[in-house]
Amino acid sequence: MSKEKPIIVWFRRDLRVSDHPALSAACAAGVPVIAVFIKDDIVDGLGAAPKWRLGKALEVFTQTLARLNIPLILREGPAGDVLDALITETDAQGVYWSRLYDPACVTRDTAIKADLRSKGLEARSFGGHLMFDPWTVETK
């Protein structure tokens, strides 16, 4: 019997299960889903109060995902390295995430997507933070 390869859903600023296109797509694929939140340099740059709120939000989010039989893995380090290690550990087929639009995140996410695809893995980003992606809006 062959084991289905899971899809990793990388959560960042989008700790929710409703109206989450990346999570919906992963669940619709019919394979196991693994959720991950990575404490990286961007999270490290937060002040004490936002870090406290994030910790509390992650506690609640872990319980919410558990009710859906989706484990939430918490890791620390550079996102690309953490995702590579998690893919190796879980034999995942790919990673899905919601797009972020600030320059540092765009640069990081573009590099991660290229790296994953170069390894033959699925790397999909989804809208989810804005009503429209910035490049789709035009003035008349």
Describe the role of every protein-language-model region:
Residues 1-140:
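Trp/Phe/Arg-rich N-terminal binding region typifying the photolyase-homology
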